Amino acid sequence: MPKVALYNQNGQTIGEIELNDAVFGIEPNKHVLFEAVIMQRASMRQGTHKTKNRAEVSGGGRKPWRQKGTGRARQGSIRSPQWRGGGTVFGPVPRSYSYKLPKKVRRLAIKSALSSKVLENDIVVLDQLSLEAPKTKEMVKILNNLAVDRKALIVTDELNENVYLSARNIPGVKVVAANGINVLDVLSHDKLVITKAAVEKVEEVLA
């Protein structure tokens, strides 16, 4: 089982914590991580694109000029796609791009993401994270104590309003509850700052 240092909010090492091998100690599967990120990014797409086809554009149904005798190419409608202002053929329509990967694959992906953070030594485990009031200054101080000076994902056992409000104005820092942890967030942040209670909650679900 991988062991990592356990810190307090002052950045002091107060012990060690053993992480579950089945969650934090597997060989990261890069292909599964790729598939999970693509799935999440696809679900984030708006899908509100739309073009008008020849039935929807403005213009009458009258034939622009007679079939023969003008010397011009024959035309049946000013709404044809080759006309300026004509309808689009096979244009995009509003749709949802979201899809789901199998549950086993999604679980393997999040385990791979967490294990990669342990392998790269980019995980910081806190005994607890609590603030008496929402103070951005206090959160910056805690992160400085922990030597976290890059993009960081903070994971708590449940969403703490004071922690969330204190971190939301810090560039590159995001706070999520343990039940909302996902592959894209873990991989797109350089450091994973997670509380001991959140580790237990994640292990309970994924182990």
Swiss-Prot record:
Q: Where is this region: Disordered?
A: 44-85
Q: Which gene encodes it?
A: rplD
UniProt lists the family membership as follows: Belongs to the universal ribosomal protein uL4 family.
Q: Identify the PANTHER family for this entry.
A: 50S RIBOSOMAL PROTEIN L4 (PTHR10746), LARGE RIBOSOMAL SUBUNIT PROTEIN UL4M (PTHR10746:SF6)
Q: Which GO terms describe its cellular component?
A: ribonucleoprotein complex; ribosome
Assigned keywords, A-Z: Ribonucleoprotein, Ribosomal protein, RNA-binding, rRNA-binding
Instruction: Give the domain of life.
Output: Bacteria
Indicate the quaternary assembly: Part of the 50S ribosomal subunit.
The protein, known as = Large ribosomal subunit protein uL4
As one GO molecular function, the record gives: structural constituent of ribosome
Reported function: One of the primary rRNA binding proteins, this protein initially binds near the 5'-end of the 23S rRNA. It is important during the early stages of 50S assembly. It makes multiple contacts with different domains of the 23S rRNA in the assembled 50S subunit and ribosome. Forms part of the polypeptide exit tunnel.
Q: Which InterPro entries match?
A: Ribosomal_uL4, Ribosomal_uL4-like, Ribosomal_uL4_dom_sf
Q: Name one Pfam family in it.
A: Ribosomal_L4
HAMAP family given in the database record: Ribosomal_uL4_B
